[in-house]
Amino acid sequence: MAYTTIDDPSAYFQTTLYSGTGSTASVTNGGNSDLQPDWVWIKARNATRDHRLLDSTRGVQKELVSNSDAVEYTESTGLTAFQSDGFQHGGANGYGASGENYVAWQWKANGGTTTTNDASSTGVGGLDSVYQANTTAGFSIVTYTGSGSNTTVAHGLGNVPEVIIFKKRTDDTEDWLVYHHTQGNASAGKLNTNDAWETGSASLFDSTTPTSSVFSIKTNSKVNDSSDTYVAYCFSEVQGYSKFGNYTGNGNADGAFVYLGFKPALIIVRATDTDNWRMYDHKRADGHNVIDVRIIADTNAAESQDDNECDFLSNGVKWRSSSGGVNSDGQAYTYMAWAEHPFVSSKGVPVTAR
């Protein structure tokens, strides 16, 4: 069996940097493969601006903000089109304002083509849902309308999701919730805050681990209020392309090594205690170690630079800091990571070191 099924991760995930001009412009990706994104996460690097998250299921201009509990908002001069190898944006603050530099993390699902699951007809799940899934890359975007009763929802992955990111879209404000398999089915993180990982959350996921076809939700306004709409971003691991795990910090400058099985393009790290969601990628550090530039997903702050945060290696991440946000002694951390290149290709060719 081949080590990986994805030799070119840029077909499914890319990080792109661009600068705003105050006018409508297209952003073209620079990876080996063209990537028409279905989920785009944009952040101004040099300005205090909200994170902007948009997807091709909910449609252009429909933004959610990772650092806020706000409902879905329509920004007419924000992201205005998903294109064959990138996207088009207007001149709005946080998207294309003059003098602002941006990073855009982009994932491919199914090109905007969705599947409607009629639960009563298919027998899959207890609640109707709409999903667009990319089973090769282990990513699906699911939308559904809450029932207010304990139920299950089809996700379309065909594999068990290790991570699900939930957000209520309408009616009233609610926290983002993150299910992470390493924390169990009665625990949740809040993407928009630095609160400690919430334990004993049986009222969210019904203390039930997702299956290869559905995830479970209980009667809770964060995930299942009657008649309100929700989006869930679901991820399952693909060897050599994505990994969702945990590690324990050692508190030393010669820090913990996290084996991923690939050279990372993006890693999002979160302590299970009170701390921020930290985002590191290979582009903002100019493609070289040490990776010393981070963005915080739960604040609107500009990116910051610290000495010797980590190295991106051919097979994982080596922490070079004793920072409490990534490597405090004895502290447990969760992470989500996607590849620039697999450690070994499907033909057995190893990647070169960074």
List each model region and its residues:
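Surface-exposed molecular-recognition determinants
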Residues: M1-R354
